[in-house]
Swiss-Prot record:
Protein name: Guanylate kinase
Subcellular location: Cytoplasm
Gene: gmk
Function: Essential for recycling GMP and indirectly, cGMP.
Keywords from the UniProt entry: ATP-binding, Cytoplasm, Kinase, Nucleotide-binding, Transferase
GO CC annotation terms, alphabetical: cytosol
Example GO molecular function: guanylate kinase activity
Entry similarity comment: Belongs to the guanylate kinase family.
NCBIfam families: guanyl_kin (TIGR03263)
Amino acid sequence: MSERGLLIVFSGPSGVGKGTVRQEIFSKSDHKFEYSVSMTTRAQRPGEVDGKDYFFRSREEFEELIRNGQMLEYAEYVGNYYGTPLAYVNETLDKGIDVFLEIEVQGALQVKKKVPDAVFIFLTPPDLNELEERLVGRGTDSEEVIAQRIERAREEIALMSEYDYTIVNDEVPLAAERVKRVIEAEHFRVERVIGHYRNMISDKRLSDK
């Protein structure tokens, strides 16, 4: 049975450990996902490879893709565009490969409007106190910035109902395993495979044998 890949949208508050969990998933040889390559208008840095680290495009090229509806989601940050090219995602999914998109909540909501049958997974901390401890432990943000991130986390957690699944990141290996189990189960949802079986039972050649 030929099956199109799944678009997996993975997000959660800043500091919850999205990148760490994603790295844990991709560190295992048994995963069958491809990490989504983002597009940006920022300058290519030494050692970066176009098409691997990012798709590097000019501002004019990026804005033309926006006008033509060819960006799955995008945002402007510090004067540069960042986003997910729709053509790349569709080409990968058409090969039967799942695409793993780690993204902020607002970007995920953009994706949901365009690809409602994607799998939306929200990663949460055990509680906000632990999230604050993780942010403090980074040692990169001031108290003011941490307070802003906690407030934003409250707002993002309030949008959890827009997602299909929530995974608690209490331990990274366990959280990664839960994510993989969710994706595996999604491949067996009736609505994803029923078309194949409808075609199978309507094939009159079977009754002629």
